Amino acid sequence: MIRVISLFLVFVSLASANIFDFLNNNFAGRGQQQGGQVQTPEQYENAILNTNCGKYVCPDTGMCVEAPKFCPCPYPSSQLRCFLPDGRYLCISKPAGDISAKYDDPKSNWKVDAKDDNIRDCGWVSRAWRGLV
């Protein structure tokens, strides 16, 4: 009987440790960025506005580029930059699965069109823009 109670207490303590670790990681650290720096929207805005850039500062990444069309996506390893007919662009998640290797080259991945409305790539964005989806 004592052995059963001991095992029960061990399992309860392990479960509660995991729960508190989960709560601490997901709720106590809210609002913190990687590296432990907390940045409010006002601080972010000031950092972007005070960037030493003579060209164009991308609002999503803070990078200095020649023109808005050269702004990279915030997460280039998992996003495609799709150009719209009006010259703007938007970033979408790269398609997954068997077709995903086609989208690995950032210089050409925006040109790939699977021609399948079930695969959301830049071709799909273009068709959606024209009202064909």
From Swiss-Prot:
* Protein role: Probable component of the endoplasmic reticulum-associated degradation (ERAD) pathway.
Source organism per UniProt = Scheffersomyces stipitis (strain ATCC 58785 / CBS 6054 / NBRC 10063 / NRRL Y-11545)
By its UniProt entry, which InterPro entries does this protein fall under?
Answer: LCL2
Q: Which domain of life is it from?
A: Eukaryota
Q: Which UniProt keywords apply?
A: Signal
Q: Which residues cross the membrane?
A: none
Please list which residues make up the signal peptide: 1-17
Asked whether the keyword Signal is assigned, the reply is yes
Q: Show the CDD domains listed in the entry.
A: LCL2-like
Task: Tell me a GO biological process for this protein.
Answer: ERAD pathway
The lineage is: Eukaryota, Fungi, Dikarya, Ascomycota, Saccharomycotina
What's the protein called, per UniProt? Long chronological lifespan protein 2
| Sequence similarity | Belongs to the LCL2 family.
